[in-house]
Amino acid sequence: MSDGAFDAGRTGGLLRLSQWLSPAFPVSAYAYSHGLEAEICHGRVRDGADVAAWIEGVVRRGAGRTDAIVMLSAMQAGADLDRLHDLARALAGSRERWEETRDQGAALAATLAAMGEGDGVARAYPVALGAAAARLDLAADVVAALYLQSVVGNLVSAAVRFVPLGQAEGQRIVAGMQGAVADVAAEVVNCSIDDIAQAAFGADLAAMEHEGLEVRIFRT
């Protein structure tokens, strides 16, 4: 049983990271679909099963895994953040995908600076997040898991609004992704940037295709 004392170390770190990854944190995560909107518009993602398969591909083989590796690299002592920022840009794959990670990273850095945390330098989102998380008393696998969970949550939120899915079905998808999140989090702690590879080609192509949509709800 807790004695009521607040642990400013690990507990404080978990609370701060959860705050940064919360939908309430002003990085406008709700405005991005990562190309999912294009998949839905063209009928390639039609229901909850399609959504779950698409998101799992992003987590295991796409930007989820890749960005987690970049983020953990930014957490390391002496990390070259400018180099990692350039790498994140090279990995983005399309204009909108780059804008998504660039703008969210800039918003994260600016908000943290306004809170008295961080230098306010605008960097790609996984780099900005990793640099901030490096100051927390948290294990790398915990940071990776919470980050990947937030990726899943943001994409499910987009699907709930646009497929549309019911709220309960959306939460079943989030719960069903816990295995993928745990697997990838355990993997990436042993990875370096040399281990980066992407094979979520459908998601990458959808992100490019989204640029040509005449009517859209999401920025990407």
Curated annotation (Swiss-Prot):
Principal subcellular localization: cytoplasm
Pfam families hit by this protein: UreF (PF01730)
Keyword Chaperone assigned: yes
GO molecular function: nickel cation binding
Keywords: Chaperone, Cytoplasm, Nickel insertion
Highest taxon of source: Bacteria
UniProt key word Flavoprotein: no
Assigned GO CC terms: cytoplasm
Compartment list: Cytoplasm
Protein family membership: Belongs to the UreF family.
Quaternary context: UreD, UreF and UreG form a complex that acts as a GTP-hydrolysis-dependent molecular chaperone, activating the urease apoprotein by helping to assemble the nickel containing metallocenter of UreC. The UreE protein probably delivers the nickel.
PANTHER family: UREASE ACCESSORY PROTEIN F
Role description: Required for maturation of urease via the functional incorporation of the urease nickel metallocenter.
Protein name as it appears in the record: Urease accessory protein UreF
Organism of derivation: Jannaschia sp. (strain CCS1)
